[in-house]
Amino acid sequence: MIKEVVKITNVNSDVYRGCKYLAELVIIMNGEPATIFVGFKDNYPGSLPLFFDLNDSFGRIPHKEKDGFICFTRSEAIVIDKRYPVSLLLNCLENVIELIAKGISGENHEDFQLEFEAYWCHIVKGKIYGAIDTDNYNVREINLWCETSESNFTIVASEKNIKNTEVIMNTLFHIDIYQEEKFRCIYIPLKHGTSILPPAAEEEWDYSFVKNIFSKHITKKSKQKFQRIIRRKGNSTKKLEFIIFGLPISNENTALFAYVMPGTGIDYLHPLVQKPKNVNLIPLMVERWHPNYLLNRTGGNTEVADKHVAIVGVGSVGSEIATRFAKSGVQHITVIDNDILEMDNVYRHALGNDSVYARNEDNQLINVPKVLALEKEIRRKYPFIQVTSLPKSFVELWEEGSINWKDYDLLVIAIGLANQEMDINEKMHSMKQPPPTIYAWNEPLGIGGHSLITLNNEKKGCYQCLFKPMEGKTIHNRSSFTKPNQDFSKDLTGCGSIYVPYSFLDSEKTAMLVVENSLKLLTGKLQDNPLLSWKGDDSQLKSEGFATSHRYSSNKDK
């Protein structure tokens, strides 16, 4: 594999990506000798060797960057065993040679498309923070604002159908769109099957090349739509024009690249139609923030974006459930609770100390309702989410008749009080078209937590049935992991501070159980009405003199 090794002296680590040591290797490629360089960082073999084509021996191939660096692995996918540094080098070199061979033969030519944005970044002179829906294949106008100051120039763009744009812009980018200059930006999706090589290092496409992309790689329908956009009355921008191209790539994704260019100075005439005098094309990258992209990027679920979930009770368990629904991609969440947030609860609540108090109109310090504090926090973290907060009890809302409960795709009950939840269960079962309803609760001292799904599909499942009386025994929850008739309540300063002991970890486990199965329900993957439980360790419970139930003892799974 290696025919010759020559050590390079006086290595500039800044030039060679942190490598302190460099060697020239003569290898055999397609039966002929070829030169490649390998670099080692100080901590080798604790890190992978880096390979460079410094002499441009292999021409332009995918995964080779402008400094000659050959990116042969996306991550530290190769397991490193420090005991065998030579084997590590040879293993990596095999991968590099295979990658180069595919590049020379053209076998991985489509990787140029897959890595288009990575190459594009090498030539850009600015950035657009863009919320672009790449699943929409129509030519269309995009909102775009430029914030300029003596030391800063920020360009932000968003689809016109994104709600609460001004709030989102202020939350994410700290700009006031009403104070910034607005420019026309047109999104142009290129035809499927379009093949465009990304620009080589430090190569910039000229006006003719960009116009050729526009002329040859969009559909007739797209051209007609483009003409309608630029001819709209009052829609011309004489100063600057922004264009964002969407290039379909083979993994069903879309690469984005953008330009800003001077306007034509003529109403209803775009620079891609008529070349302006002294045209200067400035390439821009697009940093994405569209909610669909962010959800796909982080494992969220776009299938539930149109779902509306209501959570009744946003204490320790309910608040964790609400925040996890927001992270999961549910775009409309209603939170219902008439309780206030208190300092006593923050260490097992999704909200922290800073959410407990606020000042009223008379500047008096007051406790904030849980739902209002939770709405504020979710909106701050996830501004795309629509949150409706109702600081009332379920009973109040039911008696008012102000809510059409069947409009919810899912109802989660996390009050943690059996009598109230049995009442809700009765009311839900009395409806003609009740929404699927899930009940969630913790048990004390880390022994477990539960989630009961009801009214899903065949409208079966009943919370109250868990408390069905048995002859000679008091009523108790038959799903419980604790023996009946035990009092777990504690107090620190008297009756006013009574609480049931469980930790934030218990609430998070129960919330995860609920949300995981709720997502299955909302996407049609869960058809029945199961009782689901997580089983914890019983050591603390027993150390305090309590006993477990037969269900806990007979269920050996945790």
Regions found by a protein language model. Name each.
Residues N10-A77, P85-L90:
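Compact alpha/beta protein-protein interaction domains typified by the UBC
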Residues E65-E76, I80-I123:
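Domain-level detector for trafficking modules
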Residues H122-D267, K406-L410, A414-K558:
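Glycine-rich phosphate/adenylate-binding loop
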Residues A255-V309:
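N-terminal charged helix/coil linker that caps or initiates catalytic domains
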Residues R297-I340:
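Glycine-rich adenosine-cofactor-binding loop
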Residues I340-P383:
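Glycine-rich phosphate-binding loop and adjoining beta1-alpha1-beta2 segment
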Residues P391-F394:
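Conserved acidic residues
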Residues L397-K406:
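Short amphipathic alpha-helix with an adjacent loop that forms part of the alpha/beta core around
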